[in-house]
């Protein structure tokens, strides 16, 4: 693998580090704070996604960028599931998820992850890949295949469901919990906008 420095990786690395601290913070409080364990796992997934994108940008050749572009799908495929589980647990204390429900939620992401790492064989995630250079910025420029759009819709459904859980809890929570939910909603809104800009190629 070949890498080169790019200033664009610094915010992504900062996000990965912050996500790591959030993961540790949440995991240490998993026994006393409702949903803390899911928050820790969600933060880890977000951190992996950010780190993968940073390494994709820093990659100096196509194979390196492709490898780290694919690696991001570990986070891409787990963030929506973990978000809806965390939102449910956070919004409704005592709520849990059964193993059967977890398996059902994981089917599409698992298929997506397999397709991402084998996309050269079928083009269902990326039908074409090249390097995009804009000034000092360098990243993958991909044409998305059919399954990418299938998973995009699925992930938006999960993100929307989790957002609904948080919104619904605003009517039932007050004080600190209400402020926490508002912060969560703002964070999700930023994530939605960022993802839409990526999908639209902006």
Predicted regions mapped to residue ranges:
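Individual alpha-helical transmembrane segments in multi-pass integral membrane proteins
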Residues: 2-20, 30-132, 143-160, 188
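Interfacial "cap-and-anchor" motif at the non-cytosolic start of specific transmembrane alpha-helices
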Residues: 5, 9, 36, 40-41, ...
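Structural signal for the C-terminal ends of transmembrane alpha-helices
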Residues: 24-31, 88-93, 166-174
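Hydrophobic alpha-helical transmembrane segments
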Residues: 25-28, 113-118, 195-202
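A broad "ordered helical/assembly scaffold" signature
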Residues: 126-127, 139, 177-178
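Surface-exposed acidic, glycine/proline-enriched linker/cap segments
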Residues: 136-142
């Amino acid at each position: 693998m070949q890498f080169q420095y790019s200033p664009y990786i610094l915010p992504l690395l900062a996000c990965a580090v912050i996500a790591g601290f959030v993961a540790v913070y949440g995991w240490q409080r998993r026994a006393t704070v409702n949903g803390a364990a899911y928050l820790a796992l969600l933060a880890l997934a977000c951190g992996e996604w950010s780190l993968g994108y940073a390494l994709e940008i820093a990659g100096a050749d196509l194979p390196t960028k492709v490898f780290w572009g694919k690696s991001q799908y570990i986070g891409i495929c787990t963030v929506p599931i973990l978000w809806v589980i965390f939102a449910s647990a956070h919004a409704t204390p005592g709520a849990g998820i059964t193993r059967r429900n977890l398996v059902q939620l994981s089917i599409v992401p698992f298929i997506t992850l397999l397709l991402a790492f084998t996309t050269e064989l079928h083009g269902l995630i990326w039908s074409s890949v090249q390097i995009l250079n804009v000034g000092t910025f360098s990243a993958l420029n991909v044409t998305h295949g059919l399954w990418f759009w299938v998973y995009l819709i699925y992930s938006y459904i999960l993100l929307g469901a989790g957002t609904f859980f948080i919104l619904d809890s605003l009517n039932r929570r007050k004080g600190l919990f209400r402020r926490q939910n508002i912060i969560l909603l703002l964070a999700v809104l930023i994530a939605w906008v960022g993802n839409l800009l990526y999908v639209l190629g902006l």
